[in-house]
Amino acid sequence: MGLLDLCEEVFGTADLYRVLGVRREASDGEVRRGYHKVSLQVHPDRVGEGDKEDATRRFQILGKVYSVLSDREQRAVYDEQGTVDEDSPVLTQDRDWEAYWRLLFKKISLEDIQAFEKTYKGSEEELADIKQAYLDFKGDMDQIMESVLCVQYTEEPRIRNIIQQAIDAGEVPSYNAFVKESKQKMNARKRRAQEEAKEAEMSRKELGLDEGVDSLKAAIQSRQKDRQKEMDNFLAQMEAKYCKSSKGGGKKSALKKEKK
């Protein structure tokens, strides 16, 4: 099965730009950031053992998508003909996609995360991101809450209020998925979030961590490799925003609009 067919099967679209959530005219930097953002959602280290095989497959396909769009010649062929050269070295080479990902994206520190969160919440950037997520997912709060950075389930009323104000101001359309969301769906989302919070708290206790940054870093450094990976993933969730250049392309266009 070719790359485009795989994308259709796994991501619901054969459009490589839609897979990365970027516009067709996206700069190289925007393509890279799009790859980073989507890859954080499907990275094998972020799922349980039962879902690891599927996540690995998605991650590998995503890496190939980025390889095509980050290669000038391959991207030109795709843009002009809508096809992908399946025999090109870009797609045929045997690559360790996780190692490749680590080379592309550096880690950041816990202090960086805390500093970012402090300035991000309540900022114009967060406001724009929330409205963009609302548009991207056509008002689906499940996906909005998962995609917006630094958001806890307890903040849903705040997020909903921001969106409602944007609707009232005519800045975004009124989607039924948002304004007519059932209480059953809201409660299911709350239960999932509470279960995840409990699991996170149990993991924190297993690691013997208190609330201090220094003790957290010291404990992580002394633990086994698999536990270090878990923290790396937590840190990586912030890289796309924190490391984003202030120059160039601005916000990505909403292209994940095929599924309603």
From Swiss-Prot:
Biased composition range(s): Basic and acidic residues: 193-208
Stretch list, region Required for histone binding: 171-249
Domain notes: The functional J domain is required for the release from histone-dependent chromatin-binding.
Organism name: Homo sapiens (Human)
Gene symbol of the encoding locus: DNAJC9
Pfam families (alphabetical): DnaJ, HTH_DNAJC9
Modification Phosphoserine, positions: S109, S215
Assembly and oligomerization: Forms a co-chaperone complex with MCM2 and histone H3.3-H4 heterodimers. Within the complex, interacts (via C-terminus) with MCM2 (via N-terminus); the interaction is histone-dependent. Within the complex, interacts (via C-terminus) with histone H3.3-H4 heterodimers; the interaction is direct. Interacts with histones H4, H3.3, H3.2 and H3.1, but not with CENPA or the testis-specific histone H3.1t. Interacts (via J domain) with HSPA1A, HSPA1B and HSPA8. May interact with TONSL; the interaction seems to be histone-dependent.
Name of this chain's protein: DnaJ homolog subfamily C member 9
